[in-house]
């Protein structure tokens, strides 16, 4: 059975989710809601400065998109309750506006006829968060869920492997994170985050992130053991997690590498990757794994204190896992 999906919000993640869905036979995008008009929507789908041209045909007819010959309903509703998802048979909504991240607000999609909702960002209430490679097995039929953040999707699978094999006493995470749409091209007002208002292309900007603490929500055994921060850097895409942990069980760096490699080739294949190549950030543009362990970049001070490095395409990897979560909750 094909899962029919509606996308609310056609920004970076909305568009990359759409692109990724074109490569799957189990998911069909049937509707998009955004305040953009259809012609501009088609243009932004066709051309992408980071990921290149859309691989397929995109046309506009009678105010709707025709992609690879299939009609996709286009609406421009501010209130999700008015979206009439049932008219196009939507099973799951990908909530990608960043605006409806509580059960109460996301539930408007259910009111409008959708069966389930996946938030493409960390929830702002107790809506459960699910990360592939960490806690998909804990899904218990909830109709509204969150796919957490791109950084949590990188950190959680790695942290799980390390904790399951060696035990984590405590840890600090830094993500060196590519620029995102909320940042400014030149210095501008940002009342809640003064540093965040500085020019994105000119600065390395320290920032807060809830990604490490969120790992404690998807992996309760790590609750209170991890926290972290971010540096926003002047690159358009691909980020990297630096996880420094104290281990319960002593392990050489070679043993850690072996454990991660085994997981990447086994139960976490497609989520966790492993490389011993001399890679840099652009090598991961378009990477669908949400966490690729860089064996050469990590270091150990001793057998109980290590720094581990893992790469992620914060757009492509995350968007593919949004689709995996949609498929998982539709079983």
UniProtKB/Swiss-Prot annotation:
It is an enzyme of class 1 (oxidoreductase). Pfam families: Gp_dh_C (PF02800), Gp_dh_N (PF00044). Changing residue 43 to I: In strain: ECOR 70. Pathway: Carbohydrate degradation; glycolysis; pyruvate from D-glyceraldehyde 3-phosphate: step 1/5. It is found in: Cytoplasm. It catalyses: D-glyceraldehyde 3-phosphate + phosphate + NAD(+) = (2R)-3-phospho-glyceroyl phosphate + NADH + H(+). NAD(+) binds at residues 12-13, 34, 78, 120, 314. Its EC number is 1.2.1.12. SUPFAM superfamilies: Glyceraldehyde-3-phosphate dehydrogenase-like, C-terminal domain, NAD(P)-binding Rossmann-fold domains. GO terms for cellular component: cytosol; membrane. The modification N6-acetyllysine is found at residues 132, 138, 192, 249. PROSITE patterns: GAPDH. Changing residue 267 to A: In strain: E2666-74. GO terms for biological process: glucose metabolic process; glycolytic process. The record marks 177 as: Activates thiol group during catalysis. InterPro entries: GlycerAld/Erythrose_P_DH (IPR020831), GlycerAld_3-P_DH_AS (IPR020830), GlycerAld_3-P_DH_cat (IPR020829), GlycerAld_3-P_DH_NAD(P)-bd (IPR020828), Glyceraldehyde-3-P_DH_1 (IPR006424), NAD(P)-bd_dom_sf (IPR036291). The active site is at residue 150. D-glyceraldehyde 3-phosphate binds at residues 149-151, 180, 209-210, 232. Catalyzes the oxidative phosphorylation of glyceraldehyde 3-phosphate (G3P) to 1,3-bisphosphoglycerate (BPG) using the cofactor NAD. The first reaction step involves the formation of a hemiacetal intermediate between G3P and a cysteine residue, and this hemiacetal intermediate is then oxidized to a thioester, with concomitant reduction of NAD to NADH. The reduced NADH is then exchanged with the second NAD, and the thioester is attacked by a nucleophilic inorganic phosphate to produce BPG. PANTHER family: GLYCERALDEHYDE 3-PHOSPHATE DEHYDROGENASE, GLYCERALDEHYDE-3-PHOSPHATE DEHYDROGENASE-RELATED. NCBIfam families: GAPDH-I, PRK15425.1. Belongs to the glyceraldehyde-3-phosphate dehydrogenase family. This is Glyceraldehyde-3-phosphate dehydrogenase A. The lineage of its organism: Bacteria, Pseudomonadati, Pseudomonadota, Gammaproteobacteria, Enterobacterales.
């Amino acid at each position: 059975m094909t899962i029919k999906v509606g996308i609310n919000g056609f920004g970076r993640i909305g568009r990359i989710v759409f692109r990724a869905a074109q490569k799957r036979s189990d998911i069909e995008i049937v509707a998009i809601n955004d305040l953009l008009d259809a012609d501009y929507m088609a243009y932004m789908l066709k051309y992408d400065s980071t990921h290149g041209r859309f691989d397929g045909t995109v046309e506009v007819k009678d105010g709707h998109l025709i992609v690879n010959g299939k009609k996709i309903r286009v609406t421009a509703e501010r209130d999700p309750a008015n979206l009439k998802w049932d008219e196009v048979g939507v099973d799951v909504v990908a909530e990608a506006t960043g605006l409806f991240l509580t059960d109460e607000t996301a539930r408007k999609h259910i009111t409008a006829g959708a069966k389930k909702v996946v938030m493409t960002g960390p929830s702002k209430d107790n809506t459960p968060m699910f990360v592939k490679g960490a806690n998909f097995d804990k899904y218990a039929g909830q109709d509204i869920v969150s796919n957490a953040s791109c950084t949590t999707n990188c950190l959680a699978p790695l942290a799980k492997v390390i904790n399951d094999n060696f035990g984590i006493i405590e840890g600090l995470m830094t993500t060196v994170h590519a620029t995102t749409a909320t940042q400014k091209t030149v210095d501008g007002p940002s009342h809640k985050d003064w540093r965040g208002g500085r020019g994105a292309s000119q600065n390395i900007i320290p920032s807060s992130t809830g990604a490490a603490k969120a790992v404690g929500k998807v992996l309760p055994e790590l609750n209170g053991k991890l926290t972290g921060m971010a540096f926003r850097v002047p690159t358009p895409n691909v980020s990297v997690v630096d996880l420094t942990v104290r281990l319960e069980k002593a392990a050489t760096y070679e043993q850690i590498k072996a454990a991660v490699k085994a997981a990447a080739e086994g139960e976490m294949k497609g989520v966790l990757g492993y490389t011993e190549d001399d890679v840099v950030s652009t090598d991961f543009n378009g990477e669908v794994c949400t966490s690729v362990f860089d064996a050469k970049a990590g270091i150990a001070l001793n057998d109980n204190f290590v720094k581990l490095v893992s790469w992620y395409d914060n757009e492509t990897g995350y968007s593919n896992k949004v689709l995996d979560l949609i498929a998982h909750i539709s079983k």
